[in-house]
Amino acid sequence: MTMRILCLLMSLFISSSLLAEKSEKLPIKFALKFGMVKGKMSILDKFKLVKELGYDGIEVNAPSGSREEFKAASEATGLPIHGVVCSTHWKLLLSHPEAATRAKGVAGFEQAIRDAHFYGASSVLLVPGKVNKDTTYEEAWKRSIPEIRKALPLAKELNIQIGLENVWNDFLKTPEGTLKYINELDSPLVGSYFDIGNTVRYNDPSTWPSVLGNKIFKLDVKEYKRQPEGGNVWKGFKVKIGAGDNDWPAVCRELKKVNYSGWATAEVGGGDKKRLAEILTNMRKAFSH
């Protein structure tokens, strides 16, 4: 009788543990990019709208000509600017063949770090380089690493994380390659700004967390639908979050395994109040697994 009761209790414990594991949601804070908020409104009114809709934060470009307005709007509404996106990393590539261009890129990157600190943000999103007709994969690697290192003392001084985003730049397209690059920079302040939708065309997003682990600093959120052979691959981003080929339950499961918690920022086509509300609803559903 005692053994029966013991077995029953153990069975109930295991069942409840599995149920709790299944129902536990990722501790996510939801944000969007400032440029997604459309309409003829002041910066302050846009911050008010985002706050009203229930977003936890917002991300802005830096350097920016609206620096003071962004900070004032954040303070007035209580909506935190959790991070900034380096606004110079495409025009002034850190992998550019010309040293003068790379130097300008570093200057823009360092200003983004200063702006992040000014806002009370914790990170700068950075695209580290690009492979093109002028730059091979190996050259992009060898040129960009030293340039990023130049900004690391400032990042350390101001305690700003550098999140390297995986984008369609033909560079760092796998989690293994991304981790190797991060490890070569050898700084606790350098990690991955993991863009979930950007990987779907190349590989399964759910395979990234197990490789990168705690090097995933933040998440960019978009959806993607794989296109037929010969089709316009950019059309794949037209689908709403949750309506594409991304396996959100698998992504959530893998993020839980590495104990991810923190920011998930939408990077999709924005719009008016109704559209922004829809995006937040779709994100919450995607991360509910």
Model features per residue range: what roles?
Residues 7-16:
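Bacterial N-terminal signal peptides
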Residues 51, 76, 84, 149-245:
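Acidic/histidine-rich catalytic cores of soluble enzymes
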Residues 37-42, 57-70, 93-94, 132-135, ...:
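Acidic-and-aromatic substrate-binding clefts and catalytic sites of carbohydrate-active enzymes
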Residues 2-5, 19-117, 156, 187, ...:
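N-terminal pre-domain/capping segments
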